[in-house]
Swiss-Prot record:
Gene transcribed to yield this protein: bre1
Coiled-coil features, chain-numbered ranges: 50-91, 149-169, 196-269, 331-1003
Stretches with biased composition (Low complexity): 25-34, 284-312, 319-330, 994-1014
Pathway(s) per entry: Protein modification; protein ubiquitination
Protein's UniProt keywords contain Cell membrane: no
SUPFAM superfamilies: beta-sandwich domain of Sec23/24, RING/U-box
Species: Dictyostelium discoideum
Protein name: Probable E3 ubiquitin-protein ligase bre1
Family recorded in the similarity comment: Belongs to the BRE1 family.
Amino acid sequence: MSMDHQDLKRRDPPADSESQRPSKKISLSSSEASVPIGGPPIDQNLILFQNRAMKVRVEEQKIEINDREQKIKQLNTKIHQYKENISCLCRVWDQLNSGLDLLINRVDFENAMDNLLPKDNITESFEFLSSYITEPVTLDEKYTLDQSLQKKVQKTQSTFSKISKALEKEHTLSKFVFRLLKSKDGIKSNDIEKLLKEDNDKLSKQNQYIQNIYDKVQIQFKQLTDQTTHLADQAAIYQQNNKELKLELEKSQDELTIERKRVIKLQDETLRTPQVKIPSPSLGSNIPGGANNNNNNNNNSNNNNNINNNGNNMGGSGSSSLASSTNGINKQQSNDINGKELTHEELIAELQRQSDSRLLEARKLREEKAILLKELQQIQIDIRVIPEERIQNSMPYQVLRQRYQLVSDELDIHRNQCTKLQNDLAQATIGRRLEREALEAFEAHRRQNIERRVSQLEVESIELKGEKEKLVCLIEQRNPNVPSLQYIQESRLLLDKKDDEIKQLRKEIEQLKLDIEKYKAPKEEIERYKLLVQRDVESKNIEINKLLEKINTITKQNNDLKSNEQQLLQKESELTLSLNILKSNKNNININNLDKDNIEDNSKIKQQQEQQQQQHQKIDNNNKKEEEIKKEQQQQQQQQQQQQQQQQQQQQQQQQQQQQQQQQQQQQQQQQQQQQQQQEEQKKDKEMIDIEKSTENIINNNNNNNTNEQKLNEINKNIENGNNENNNNNENTINNENTINNNNNENKDKIIFNLELNESKLKLELSTVKKQLEDITKSKEEYDNEIKEINEKFKAQIKELDITISQNKIQQESQKQELEALVMEIDSMGKAYEQMLEQNTRLTKQLSDKEDTHAHLMAENIKSQQTIRNSKEIQLAIEEKLNRNEEKLKSQGELMQKIEEKSNILQKQLSKVTEDLHSCSFDLEKHKRFVRENNAHSLELKTQLDHLSNLNAELKKKADDSIFALEREIDKAKRLDEEKQLLKKKLEKATSANNNNNNNNNNNNNNNNNNSSSSEEELKLINQRLRCTICNDRQKNYVIAKCFHVFCKECIYSNIDTRKRRCPSCNRAFAETDVHQIYY
């Protein structure tokens, strides 16, 4: 019940949860604001989300609680089973002890052969039994068993020790007898064998007898186990029945207390009813004569005697109520009984009889109530006699106690959780406010950053424009014949496109500014679009940088080519000078040597040079012819294409003129556009041709330069070698001349001698010169061969260069294709950029559509983040609680493992004990008797309960009837009292009238007195009418609206309090709302 109550408490939402939540106000400055409490909530989706989350949490917590309850139930069942096992173990242990006692009594282990044993101590032990029948292991101090269990363990250990000792004695006796038999000489081996066989037979019979007993004991043990299970089930049923009986007794006690209270209330009401008021003697003092006084005194004395007698019989408490109960009879019965008029004395006698009979009935009822009270007291005493230890030691009481503890612990835990959740809610509200303020500041800061970024982009666009203008100026300063003009024009077009794109971006930025001022775009989408725009701008900037780098590389290449051409020209002039010098040197050599061979060689060299020059001229002419042929072919192709296009256009014009005469203006416009396109195509083709020519010239120049450089290097080498040889010859001639001059200057006497010597020397020199000439001729031949080889090498190199030229042409064509592909890519990039611009426009439109809901989305995002944070905190708290619970469960599992280990040890001990069980009948009989006694006692209690319940029902009925009868009698007694008073007054009037008639003549003055007495009587009657008919004390204040009978306030509300709610005069039912006050 406590858990259900707790769940109900959980399900109840907090009282001021919705009223305390701040609602939203639609504004542009702030995303959230407070709304009056009476206004409707704006963020209903968030409330639904929170409700769903709370439902999920509650369901998860319920599942966790159910799992924990199941685990607790499992633990309780295990503990219950453990306790039942212990109880069964105790029972079996008792049975085992009793069986062992019986076995010891039946079998005499101690024989009369003790005297035959030797006096020396026998050290041997019966190892077989000691190994087979081991004493149970002593329990550790950790195991906290009851004292009864420990005593039982000690008993079993002592019995097993006795059995082992007896068997050891028997073994020692058998050994001793065997030794005695061996020691005797008169006894033969056959006799010994016979004795041993007899002993073996006896032992086998004893073993069989013991085995039979053991089998019977096992059968009895099985039966006892079955009976114990059956008895345990019956005991549980009886416990349940006892519980039900206790509950019924408690209910009966509650009902009896209620009835006692009702009886006490009735007694109080009867005490409240006043006694019969006798008229005071002062009222009758004015009446003449003493007869009236005597009569009144007699009547009063009779009434007082009756009242006193009734008071003695009923006791002091009920005297007034019963005295008033004698005054309740109808007016018709008072005046007429069986059609006869009765006197006043007869009426009084009948009333006394009725009151006596009713008093007797009341006495009987009181006696019956006293008997019932005694019986109830006896039942209470019987219940109290039940010992508290028995109730406390019972399993259900302990289980209930444990459950109560668990439930109390869980209640404490849940209370702590509730307090924590309340604190978390308070912190969450504070956190929401702080986060709102932070978000407002963040949005303002973000707007400022966006405006700064826009200004930075404008500055960057202005800088790009300046750089573009500088580039345009640099490009215009260059020569238009440079082959990079096409790239420059393309770059200009791209730059113009970029300018247009930048202008469009500026327009879009201005639109975005306007849109941002109007609306608020969501944060994430704005960041995404910013990133996209930045990426596009960066990609375009990268493309611009690449184009600028290409332009710079092309300009550098052109500059390098120009410098190379200048260098080549300088080298050619230097080579011409070097050739002239070589020629002059060669001429000098030829003049000095005067050899024909040298002249022929020079002519050959000249011829070779001329041939080389002619070959170069031929190659150049061939290249020029090929270029001219290509140009002519291209021009022819262009002319053919133009002619074809013109023919097609003429055909189209003719068809259009025939079919559509009305659309001549449009056709003219189309023709103009087509002509412009043709011109642009022609321009493009010319530009491509110029580019091709320039590339071919560059390649040829490079190749020619390379070949010329190689040739010049070889020629320089040859010239250097020739110069060296000529220098040697010149030195020789100069030496000869010097010698001649020296000889001329010498003495004439020695001229002849010197001439002879000179002739001899000259001969020698001539011979050496001839040898040198031969060597020179050989060297010339070698040089000729080398020149031939060099020519061949140059021819091979020329062929290789032709091959490289063809390859370069192929590469040039591939580069053209690549250029075309790049142009196509640039076009595609432009189209993609236009598509991106269109997408940007669409996205701006989407942003303008979505900016209306941005405030709501931001608020929902904030709240969702807060709920996520709260949920994370709650999850962390739940995880901590789960960890704690898991630790508790682990500790409980460890305890259960210890308990299971204990139970396993006990089960092992049980398995050992059950092997040596012999009898368990006495305990069974005891239990049976106990169960029978319990059955008989329970049957008696049931019969008593049934009897008491019947008595209670009858007493309730009787009490209700008696109460109803007493109330009626009280009303009748009150009415009778009123009638009595009226009759007394009538008697007084009659007596006074008689006296007046007798004394009319004598006392005329008494008329005045009679008139005064009659007026007093009228006043009394009026007072009686104004007084309440129930109590005759208080005035009538309240009216019952249904029957219009008037009573005093106290009497009516006493009727309402007793839940009777019927009119005392007409017995008509009424409600508390039918009672109204009267004002005189």
